[in-house]
């Protein structure tokens, strides 16, 4: 029987300057997820990639290392190279349309102006992948969006990040379990 292959993608911007920005919450969550496993990243100039294999499930953990708006190149490359279909991809990203701390797992949909998602949709040629949307709040005017997502969390928000990361991890574990159950379901012939 074939293994189920899943791709978990945390998107953000590379480098210490951006490490704790709102835009990098995808990296923070993916790193926490990987820390709870025995795997570690292998890094090249384009991405950091880790892999776990257990109970018939291969999970790839991907952090694209080009800027956010070029995230799709690494996602498409890893998906294609490993035969991973879009419905087995989960992208973890910041969401300005949600108040801080709101989390939502969603399949498909538009990019809502998020340049990282826009590029992933473009490079995969579809929007049918899953997303874990992490609410980071919204600035008062649209012209402030870029500065806002590239700013660090407020101290009172930073305090809540560890708990919200744990909730995010549970949502990811649940998604992996659902994908596994779907994969193992006998097909109707």
UniProtKB/Swiss-Prot annotation:
GO CC term (a single one): cytoplasm
Pfam families: Pept_tRNA_hydro
MF GO annotations: peptidyl-tRNA hydrolase activity; tRNA binding
Database matches in InterPro entries: Pept_tRNA_hydro, Pept_tRNA_hydro_CS, Pept_tRNA_hydro_sf
Gene3D superfamilies, sorted: Peptidyl-tRNA hydrolase
GO terms, biological process: protein quality control for misfolded or incompletely synthesized proteins; rescue of stalled ribosome
Site (Stabilizes the basic form of H active site to accept a proton): 94
Catalytic residue list: 23
Top EC class of this enzyme: hydrolase
EC number: 3.1.1.29
Locations listed in the record: Cytoplasm
Site for Discriminates between blocked and unblocked aminoacyl-tRNA, residues: 13
Reaction catalysed by this enzyme: an N-acyl-L-alpha-aminoacyl-tRNA + H2O = an N-acyl-L-amino acid + a tRNA + H(+)
The keyword Cytoplasm is annotated on this UniProt entry: yes
First-listed, main subcellular location of the protein, grouped into a coarse class: cytoplasm
Keywords: Cytoplasm, Hydrolase, RNA-binding, tRNA-binding
Residue numbers binding tRNA: 18, 67, 69, 115
Function (record text): Hydrolyzes ribosome-free peptidyl-tRNAs (with 1 or more amino acids incorporated), which drop off the ribosome during protein synthesis, or as a result of ribosome stalling.
Assigned protein family: Belongs to the PTH family.
Subunit structure: Monomer.
Protein name, as recorded: Peptidyl-tRNA hydrolase
Organism of derivation: Leptospira borgpetersenii serovar Hardjo-bovis (strain JB197)
Lineage summary: Bacteria, Pseudomonadati, Spirochaetota, Spirochaetia, Leptospirales
